From Swiss-Prot:
Entry's localization field: Secreted
Positions of the pro-segment in this chain: 773-818
Protein name: Venom prothrombin activator pseutarin-C non-catalytic subunit
Disulfide bonds: C170-C196, C251-C332, C503-C529, C672-C1032, C966-C992, C1147-C1298, C1303-C1457
GO molecular function: copper ion binding; peptidase activator activity; signaling receptor activity; toxin activity
Length: 1460
């Protein structure tokens, strides 16, 4: 644990930080200054350290030159001692809410580096990140500290960024160097930052409520991208590879806090697993921590089982590469504090479950039935055995359940198709004991290892990578023909939490060699349940139906039986080249329950049933499996979503309500292999009264499995189809002996019999197997066959369909509205159009091997005003940031969305929506759903065709509670989702609470932005020429694609329109519809946020997984321009970043028309009448001619223009007319245009749906009318265009706003916020009737004595302001004064400043490095404004007059902001 010094906070800071009360049970400590002395230094690092005696013999090939953070004593001469476990990690920084962290940083390395935190409150000169944020050189010293230099970073831990009520005591973040994210990380510059609740830390910085805490970083270091390049890829924990991580120590009954960091410069996922243990993360019980590169998690664990346990990432390539270590739990004599005492009633409910499970070898057919709709390329690659491929049948090993320990009578005679390749379902609730008698009937050693429960070493069933042969016990590897009994109890610490589902989804598998055993087929599902979740039969109480779906990738190349399969199924086994990429790929099978293609049978559910899905990802997969449910949504962890992301070797439990008639698809979203292999269709249908009667009769039996009822004729038909379970010749003898097949190898079907009491036992076994039964009303032979029902035509009994009439979208919408009776119809006109899209600029650090093409033909969605599709709906300021995205489709809960879609592109496209409810005729996606032709016209709209989609917004599509305003989804073309999206056809859907959308179809009182994070791969676009695709050689050597563009909303680096006010509620809707490898971790510099609907959890970064739609809420606390980026370094470097600007909420300052700061030459117009020149258009101007005026002629469009000579923020406009000879002239209505360059003009649209917003003008010639500009305009040129007027178009104007860089508010001279005592001078003039004291030097002060005058007029005089604390001063306005008839003002002056009121420094001219002399006033009443570039950072400032008119007289205002 790192050491640091702690100092009390000054009283003023203490008062500022103590505003957060914290949790009641925390002892509130005084806020502290926690000081760290950290250096970046060179170090030779060995990823695979050898024992000392071996390391002397040979130099390791794994030694690399790294730059690392290390903690030092105060003088940076002596390094602080450190824990060997921390490895490459820098010291762990800790702070409680209310604390300030001061990091004294010194760079001992040879490269400029920095320190940047993922979460903290900091100003611009403590950010540690370099980008174009408009700051001055003095504020950029933190960005990159040169070698040999030092810098002091100051970070504050405020209540706004601290852990929320539901968070753990400390949240985990990372700090790292942000000079070059890719090279800095791969060089080793990273450490952990813990932000903790008030009162949660001990004096030494450790946590109070845990016995131990550990930081583990699972990381992939690419040494070829280190500053000191050396080709190598290292998979490590804390920088240790191949199990060389020092053992993590714990005692039995310890409570451990784990702070886990994932890191890689490329997209990476980690499935962190602690063998034999369970954890709690965000109030959910888990056995695997889902971690992505660039993000961190906090979890806790209570341990009780002693022994040495494996810590690893279960991603297949991580296991093979040696990413593992060990947790060593010892018996330290501690009492058992984890097991609670049970009542007598609870003791009586404890159950002992006994399973008899064997491992058997079979021939498995991955696709016993191949529908004609299967993609032909996929079929040729994976299912056919042409080209000397193995095909779709493989020898495998599976788990099979038996009736008893004799292992002679399987629980099912015929292999249940619905179960697929899975072993039997093992279920248990807390305190239950599970006994598994395992017999190995296979030809090699196997075992059973269970996830999600705490087990003892003798019940673990797993061999570790470093286990010597002599340590391999019988339970770890059960030899062929042997029997071993695994026994374990579900502990209190394993029980699902209050937030969890009744039963949480886990898995079991053989773990002799985990990768090869799973590849061979040995997997099964495990359910760990709450204490009241199961009936005595093992059936879940709170669900109508349970369904298991295991998304497994079987890499047959790693199976134990590869050689057997080559010999049996390849046409020429001796010619097979196992390292041939095509052959290898053909053996990687993407399956759902072991099936690698859709099946002809369709899973059946009853309308309104509540289905509990148990979803698991297993196998040789190194990417996320996104599971998409069409026409319905999952309810998981309190959130409705239609895509669930499964990490390798992890499971999710989700509830689905069957509320949408039709045949729908459950499939994996993403790659071609996944979407074709991992899929099944299911039927949501009403059944006849007879079925319903049967269901009611058996209601009390508690069986909750879906319908597999098969009429006898269907069974007979199925007998003609090859059964998927085909015994090997070696297994035939056993099958015959067991009476499972006859002499000819045909399955034996038992005769029909009357249902008996034994059926209940049979049904309980079906439950254990995860089978789907028809409420107990099925005959035994039908139950044992467990074939799926012949699907009914869901549309045949659908009263909505009349096949004799044409589809009428208005009737469909009307029916929806009549059903709900409280919604509105919202109509959109959207077209698909082809455009040329330019990704340029390529970027500041982009390197490409040949001339980079950045302009590509794409298709986009565009909104139109009506069904003629002649007039596009022009986007305004609110749409400026959307980039390539289609128009935002907004609706409220219970609304109906009607979209008339026209395909103006050259190939078929459609519209497919996520999260909404629709009939099959509005799905916009094509698959074999048994729909009538009438319902298939939506699948693909031909070029120039038109179709109307109707989508309903049920409550599940909208916000889950009152704190959430709107929920985000997406729509896209679903003809070929991958290619359509990469072509550009995608847009956002926002579903809001009732009353949140105004008449212009915009959300009320919400600042919202939609960001789509996507790596566009133009080679996957429909429009990419095949001749331009990357060569095979380029792909094989991993050359960065010339045609991929990481971007936000399709725009690398420079997304525009992200402007907001300080402290306002900003809602960000974040989308990721990329493939399984598209992992983005979103970070907003200088800000933290919460996820909508989950405000109890604080976030510093947000992992954005494939198919994710996340709505987050932020209250920006720091003004300025900030970076929004992905934490995945390689994508960030190539363009997945943007800038957002936070404007001061007081950004409504007069910009200088009335005061004269804006010169006459800066005001121009299309023309004027008489003497009414544009330079007169100044608010409250006086005189005979005091405004701009023009006579409007027919077909002329007059305007007046202000050139602000720099980019500024405009937030409001004040206008006046004029009166001459009692005649009023004024503008009644006008619109505004603006420009950055004076050539390209944009019409301000604001909230209006029309092409421009018409501002209400004046009603007479004297009254001032103020209009608010929202969103704010950032521009140099502003034009006002009068459209309606009285007498003549006439204007007197003032623009309101502030500087783009922010920090430009008045500091208090005019307002009086700066006290009189804080204003001093060298002297001041006294007369018998007045004193011209320094405290009078306030801008626009009125009165006879209204300025500062010195006693004498010479160059030694000065006016001084004490700002009381360090302040950033960005500009100054000076003004003279008039005494009697004497006009007095300062013509030139200089500026001096200091922090200590002792050593004064002159403000220098950056061009000459000499003292800068500023030009002052030219009259006594006008204003002159000067900007300090760079700004002044100081407490004291002096204005020193150099020349003056008549006498020295000053009135001033300073502008800037506080440092903190």
């Amino acid at each position: 644990m790192g050491r640091y010094s702690v100092s009390p906070v000054p009283k003023c800071l203490l008062l500022m930080f103590l505003g957060w009360s914290g949790l009641k049970y925390y002892q509130v400590n005084a806020a502290q200054l926690r000081e760290y002395h950290i250096a970046a230094q060179l170090e030779d690092w060995d990823y695979n350290p050898q024992p000392e005696e071996l390391s002397r013999l040979s130099e390791s090939d794994l030694t690399f030159k790294k730059i690392v953070y290390r903690e030092y004593e105060l003088d940076f001469k002596q390094e602080e001692p450190r824990d060997a476990l921390s490895g490459l990690l820098g010291p762990t920084l800790r702070g409680e809410v209310g604390d300030s962290l001061i990091i004294y940083f010194k760079n001992f390395a040879t490269q400029p580096v920095s320190i940047h935190p993922q979460s903290a409150v900091y100003n611009k000169w403590s950010e540690g990140s370099s980008y174009s944020d408009g700051t001055s050189d003095v504020e950029r010293l933190d960005d990159a500290v040169p070698p040999g230099q030092s810098f002091k970073y100051v970070w504050n831990i405020t209540a706004e960024i601290g852990p929320k009520k539901a968070d753990p005591p400390c949240l985990t973040y990372a700090y790292y160097s942000h000079v070059n994210m890719v090279r800095d990380f791969n060089s080793g510059l990273i450490g952990a930052l813990l932000i903790c609740k008030e009162g949660s830390l001990n004096a030494n910085g450790s946590q109070k409520f845990f016995n131990r805490e550990y930081v583990l970083m699972f990381s992939v270091f690419d040494e070829s991208k280190n500053w000191y390049r050396k080709p190598s890829l290292q998979y490590t924990i804390n920088g240790f590879a191949n199990g060389t991580l020092p053992d993590v120590q714990a005692c039995a009954y310890d409570h451990i806090s784990w702070h886990l960091i994932g890191m890689s410069s490329s997209p990476e996922i980690f499935s962190v697993h602690f063998n034999g243990q369970t954890l709690e993360q965000n109030h959910y019980k888990v056995s695997t921590i889902n971690l992505v590169g660039g993000a961190s998690v906090t979890a806790d664990m209570s341990v009780s089982r002693t022994g040495k346990w494996l810590i690893s990432s279960l991603v297949a390539k991580h296991l093979q590469a040696g990413m593992y270590g060990y947790l060593n739990i010892k018996d330290c004599g501690n009492p058992d504090t984890l097991t609670r005492k049970l009542s007598f009633r609870e003791l009586m409910k404890i159950k002992n479950w006994e399973y008899f499970i064997a491992a058997e070898e079979i021939t498995w057919d991955y696709a016993p039935e191949i529908p004609s709709s299967v993609d032909r390329r996929y079929k040729a690659q994976y299912l056919d055995n042409f080209s000397n491929f193995i095909g779709k049948k493989y020898k495998k090993a599976v788990f099979r359940q038996y009736e008893d320990g004799n292992f002679t009578k399987p629980t099912y005679a015929i292999w249940p198709k619905e179960r697929g390749i899975l072993g039997p379902v093992i279920k248990a609730k807390v305190r239950d004991t599970v006994t598994i008698v395992f017999k190995n009937l296979a030809s090699r050693p196997y075992s059973i290892y269970v996830h999600g429960v705490s087990v003892s070493k003798d019940a673990e069933g797993a061999i570790y990578p470093s286990d010597p042969k002599e340590n391999i016990t019988h339970g770890k590897a059960v030899e062929p023909g042997q029997v071993y009994t695994y026994k374990w109890t579900v502990l209190d610490t394993d029980e699902p939490t209050v937030k969890d589902s009744e039963c949480i989804t886990k898995l079991y598998h053989s773990a002799v060699d985990m990768t090869r055993d799973i590849a061979s087929g040995l997997i099964g599902p495990l359910l760990v349940c709450k204490h009241k979740a199961l009936s005595v039969k093992g059936v879940q109480n709170k669900a109508d139906v349970e369904q298991h779906a295991v998304f497994a990738v079987f890499d047959e190349n790693k199976s134990w039986y590869l050689e057997d399969n080559i010999k049996k199924y390849c046409s020429n086994p001796s010619a097979v080249k196992k390292d041939d990429p095509k052959f290898y790929k053909s053996n990687v099978m993407y399956t759902l329950n072991g099936y690698a293609s859709d099946r002809t049978e369709v899973l059946r559910f009853h309308q309104s049933e509540v289905v509990q899905w148990h979803l698991t990802s297993v196998g040789t997969v190194d990417e996320i499996v996104p599971v998409h449910l069409s026409g319905h949504t999952f309810l998981s962890k309190g959130k409705h979503q239609d895509i669930l992301n499964l990490f390798p070797m992890s499971g999710e439990s989700a509830t689905v309500t069957m509320d949408n008639l039709g045949t729908w698809l459950l499939s994996s979203w993403g790659s071609c292999e996944m979407s074709n292999g991992m899929r099944l269709r299911f039927l949501d249908a009403n059944y006849d009264d007879e079925d319903e009667g049967n269901e009611e009769e058996e209601e009390d039996d508690g069986d909750i499995f879906a319908d597999i009822f098969i009429p006898s004729e269907v069974v007979k038909k199925k007998e003609e189809v090859p059964v998927n379970f085909v015994p090997d010749p070696e297994s035939d003898a056993l099958a015959k002996e067991l009476g499972l097949i006859d002499d000819e190898g045909n399955p034996i079907i038992q005769p029909r019999r009357e249902q008996t009491e034994d059926d209940e036992e049979q049904l309980m076994k079906a439950s254990m197997l995860g089978l789907r039964s028809f409420k107990g009303s099925v005959a035994e032979e039908e139950l044992k066959h467990t074939a799926l029902a012949l699907e009914e035509d869901a549309h045949a009994s659908d009263p909505r369909i009349d096949s004799n009439s044409a589809r009428n979208p208005d009737d469909i919408a009307g029916r929806y509205l009549r059903t709900i009776n409280r919604g509105n119809k919202r109509r959109y006109y959207i077209a698909a159009e082809e455009v040329l899209w330019d990704y340029s600029p390529i970027g500041k650090s982009q390197v490409r091997s040949r001339a980079a093409k950045t302009t590509f033909k794409k298709a986009i969605f565009r909104s139109y005003l009506d069904d003629t599709f002649q007039t596009p709906s022009t986007g305004g300021e609110y749409e400026k940031h959307l980039g390539i995205l289609g128009p935002i489709i907004r609706a409220e809960v219970d609304d109906v969305i009607e979209i008339q879609f026209k395909n103006l592109a050259s190939r078929p496209y459609s519209l497919h929506a996520h999260g909404l409810l629709y009939e099959k005729s509005s799905e916009g996606r094509s698959y074999d759903d048994k729909s009538p032709e009438l319902f298939k016209k939506d699948d693909a709209i031909m070029p120039n065709g038109t179709y109307t989609y109707v989508w309903q917004v049920p409550p599940r599509s909208g916000p889950t509670d009152n704190t959430e305003k709107c929920k985000s989804w997406a729509y896209y073309s679903g003809v070929n989702p991958e290619k359509d999206i990469h072509s550009g056809l995608i847009g956002p859907i926002l579903i809001c609470q009732k009353g949140m959308i105004d008449k212009y179809n915009r959300t009320i009182d919400i600042r919202e932005f939609v960001l789509f994070f996507m790596v566009f791969d133009e080679e996957k676009s429909w429009y990419f020429p095949k001749s331009d695709k990357s060569t095979c050689e380029e792909k094989l050597i991993g050359v960065q694609s010339l045609h991929t563009f990481p971007a936000i909303n399709g725009i690398p680096y420079q997304l525009q329109g992200l402007t907001m006010y300080k402290d306002e509620n900003v809602h960000w809707h974040l989308l990721n519809m990329g493939g399984p490898k598209d992992i983005h971790v979103v970070n907003f510099h200088g800000q933290t946020f919460t996820e909508e609907g989950r405000e109890d959890n604080q976030l510093g970064v947000l992992p954005l997984l494939p198919g994710t739609f996340a709505s987050i809420k932020m209250k920006p606390s720091k003004i300025g321009t900030w970076l929004l980026e992905t934490e995945v370094g390689e994508n960030q470097e190539r363009g997945m970043q943007a800038l957002f600007t936070v404007i001061d909420k007081d950004c409504k300052l007069p910009m200088g028309l009335a005061s004269g700061i804006i010169q006459d030459s800066q005001i121009s117009a299309s023309g004027h009448v008489g003497y009414w020149e544009p330079k007169l258009a100044r608010l409250n101007n006086t005189g005979k001619y005091n405004a701009w005026s023009i006579i409007k002629k027919e077909h002329e469009h007059p305007w007046i223009q202000i050139d602000l000579q720099r980019q500024v923020v405009i937030t409001g406009i004040q206008t006046q007319g004029t009166v001459q000879l009692l005649q009023h002239s004024y503008t009644v209505e006008y619109f505004v245009t603006y420009s950055e360059d004076g050539q390209n003009w944009i019409t301000f649209k604001g909230r209006h749906s029309e092409t421009q917003m018409h501002f209400e003008g004046n009603s007479d010639g004297t009254t001032v009318k103020e209009n608010h500009i929202d969103p704010p305009i950032i521009a140099r040129y502003i034009r006002l265009h009068p459209t309606k007027f009285y007498n003549r178009p006439t204007f007197r104007i003032e623009l309101l706003g502030c500087e783009v860089e922010g920090c430009s508010v008045p500091l208090g001279m005019e307002s009086g916020a700066i006290k009189n005592s804080e204003i001093t001078a060298s002297s001041y003039k006294k007369t018998w009737w007045s004193s011209w004291e320094p405290s009078l030097a306030r801008l626009n002060l009125e009165g006879g004595t209204n300025a500062w005058q010195p006693e004498v007029n010479n160059k030694d005089q000065w006016l001084q302001i004490d700002l009381q604390h360090l302040t950033k001063i960005t500009s100054i306005i000076t003004q003279g004064a008039t005494s009697m008839t004497t006009s007095m003002y300062v013509k030139t002056f200089s500026i001096h400043y200091t922090d200590d009121n002792s050593t004064w420094k002159p403000y220098l001219d950056v061009r000459t490095s000499m003292e800068k002399v500023f030009t002052g006033n030219i009259n006594s009443d006008g204003h002159v404004k000067h900007f300090f570039k760079p700004p002044i950072l100081s407490r004291f400032i002096r204005i020193i007059p150099k020349t003056w008119n008549q006498y020295i007289a000053l009135r001033i205002e300073l502008f800037g902001c506080e440092v903190f």
